[in-house]
Structures are given as C-alpha cells and as structure tokens.
Amino acid sequence: MKDPSRSSTSPSIINEDVIINGHSHEDDNPFAEYMWMENEEEFNRQIEEELWEEEFIERCFQEMLEEEEEHEWFIPARDLPQTMDQIQDQFNDLVISDGSSLEDLVVKSNLNPNAKEFVPGVKY
C-alpha cells in the first residue's frame, strides 16, 4: 500500500535527508565510519594477551598432568626392591610390648578368663 503523502511521481527531497558519499550533511567528521579502527591496536593487543594467557594455562595443566603421571607410575616403596638391611630395620621397628603394659591390660579387661576357647564353626 502506498503512502498518501508520497503520491507525487517525483521523489521529494528534503535537505536533511540528502546523503553524499555515505555521509549526511550534519556529519562533521567524514571518517566517522572508520572510527571503529581507532582502538584496533589496543583491541588486538588485548586479544593477543588473552591468547598468550590461555596458552600459558594450557601448558601449566599439561606439565601438572605429566608430573602426576610420573609420580603415579613410580612409587619407591612399592617399585624398588628392598634390601635385607631395610627389611631388618623394619623388623627392628616393630615393638613387642613388655609385660608391664600387658598386666595393665589384663587388669582392665572385661573378658572371662574361664571361658572356653573360641573355635570357628563349632557350636556350643
């Protein structure tokens, strides 16, 4: 449907609507459409910095994973063969309590000393 105000066959030109070379007459700066480029270097620097940061974080995670795998695969206590001296030291570290602490344990015990010995699978 046509607009009745524009019923004439020739287009009406109003001074405010005239645009020359993509700019209206009111536009004082002929380079306004290129103003987005003003901060292009700062934008590029910021993006580059973010990319470097992401790469650094990725490398850190990769190194952490590699270290974790190295430690996971090699556990000295498990993977190295023990020498006789180490085994002897472990046996010497085992403490067999002396009789005095055993007597204290018996005095404080609630067990019946006259009870039958427990044998698995035998019903009394």
From Swiss-Prot:
Subcellular location, principal: cytoplasm
Function recorded in the entry: Acts as a repressor in the regulation of translation initiation of poly(A)-containing mRNAs. Its inhibitory activity on translation is mediated via its action on PABPC1. Displaces the interaction of PABPC1 with poly(A) RNA and competes with PAIP1 for binding to PABPC1. Its association with PABPC1 results in disruption of the cytoplasmic poly(A) RNP structure organization.
GO MF annotation list: mRNA binding; mRNA regulatory element binding translation repressor activity; translation repressor activity
Chain spans, region PABPC1-interacting motif-2 (PAM2): 105-120
Biological process according to GO: memory; negative regulation of translation; negative regulation of translational initiation; regulation of long-term synaptic potentiation; spermatogenesis; translation
Compartments in which it is found: Cytoplasm
Quaternary structure and interacting proteins, as annotated: Interacts with the second and third RRM domains and C-terminus regions of PABPC1 in a 2:1 stoichiometry.
Protein name stated in the entry: Polyadenylate-binding protein-interacting protein 2
GO CC terms of this entry: cytoplasm
Protein family (similarity comment): Belongs to the PAIP2 family.
Alphabetical UniProt keywords: Cytoplasm, Translation regulation, Ubl conjugation
Processing after translation: Ubiquitinated, leading to its degradation by the proteasome.
Disulfides per UniProt: none
Pfam family, one: PAM2
